[in-house]
């Protein structure tokens, strides 16, 4: 008998659908009273502790989710990814970001070729180059050391490296290595972003890393040309070769741009942009800032979770459990969003990165075979570090819509502070909130409790908390380069699990193409209107009105301008 075309046609899916009513008749107050249940929903791996007991789920729910995983052939799909099969079927590509952090002696193949030696050739090249820049043997055009780096990229070429950079900034080892150096990221084509990035920097001491696989990404290349002009106008055109390097595979365009092809660092078609932080995309700028040894620990942490994900049984497998619970929350309980809430300011850029990893991967409306999905998939991801978020959007999380939450805590702070006479230290104050918030969401506060506290009758409806709001708690022992790599890989694989269950392609992103193609038409119109004075034609009434208004208000923009660089 042929397998069902959609996961929703399987008995395991239908069984979970029927099970929803059983769960809706329970409350987390009741579920949390079952100690045996709670113990069964706690998993530890390498001192990372996952507690998912505050999910709206019983042990029966979890067993049914395991059956759903079997029906979706989850283990086989994971194996196919690691084996280099072309699981990105719409682009006919392998998906092998796990190879980017594999040990040197590993064998991971794509199209019959072990790609790990190629990965390490690039890593060795990055190590050599970054060490030469950091020790002053590679200098700028005027002989000065290159202390400042601007990485130019967008999307996955920016969000992942920025997350890791921000997380490492306050790590004692990393911050010591970065002393006297600065790393910035230029992503947005908005000239304000360029202005902010070059503000306070000297072209003589600045190295620019241009990240574009094809060297044709419109926003990235315009920003790269802007920084090339910034360098050339100060130091002369010949300085570009000493002040700009590339992460790209298009060596002819790299050379045409003015960058020595020997200073181009490769990555491959089997690396998706949002999964590329462990490639030269992230490793090069991060190594320039923190040294290769620190970044290598980050890669080792990610590899540690890669091994765990591929080998651990589902009931002990952290990414699998998180992925299955997300499917349960989205497709069965009907919760469309997820809040990522790290109780560590160092993780302030985690949510924006995972927002892209998750929403670009799983924001699909059809199956991998092109069939419309008759169920909800994908999550709306957002988040802020605690306790900042508590004073922002937690109001809605507590008394508005039900939004499942990921609480991420760190046992030992990167930067401990102790003040004489305080009841608790700063980190304990932070963690007090980390431990309290999940219970507040789970238990809530009843009208009966409020009455016992003599709350005024007219305020009781306003002060009632319904509770029964699901969350998971992830406790990391520390937050160093190794643990940051682990955390990244947990979320990457969690997203893959969701896509494997839903039966979608989590590794393409056709949704970004339509807007880009329409922008090309607008770009041509703006050029024709500015240079030739042509009126706006070929657009709907709304767009024509807006474009015309924009052109009229910027009529002072010269048709053939001389170069003007941003100034702050």
UniProtKB/Swiss-Prot annotation:
The keyword Cytoplasm appears for this protein: yes
Main subcellular location of this protein, as a coarse class: cytoplasm
UniProt pathway annotation: Carbohydrate degradation; glycolysis; D-glyceraldehyde 3-phosphate and glycerone phosphate from D-glucose: step 2/4
Subcellular location, record wording: Cytoplasm
GO cellular component terms given for this protein: cytosol
A biological-process GO annotation: glycolytic process
Catalytic activity: alpha-D-glucose 6-phosphate = beta-D-fructose 6-phosphate
EC annotation from Swiss-Prot or TrEMBL: 5.3.1.9
Active-site residues, record numbering mapped to chain: 360 (proton donor), 391, 516
PROSITE patterns: P_GLUCOSE_ISOMERASE_1 (PS00765), P_GLUCOSE_ISOMERASE_2 (PS00174), P_GLUCOSE_ISOMERASE_3 (PS51463)
Molecular-function GO terms, alphabetical: carbohydrate derivative binding; glucose-6-phosphate isomerase activity; monosaccharide binding
UniProt KW Secreted keyword: no
Keywords for the protein's UniProt record, in alphabetical order: Cytoplasm, Gluconeogenesis, Glycolysis, Isomerase
Transmembrane segments: none
Assembly mode: Homodimer.
Family recorded in the similarity comment: Belongs to the GPI family.
Designated name of the protein: Glucose-6-phosphate isomerase, cytosolic
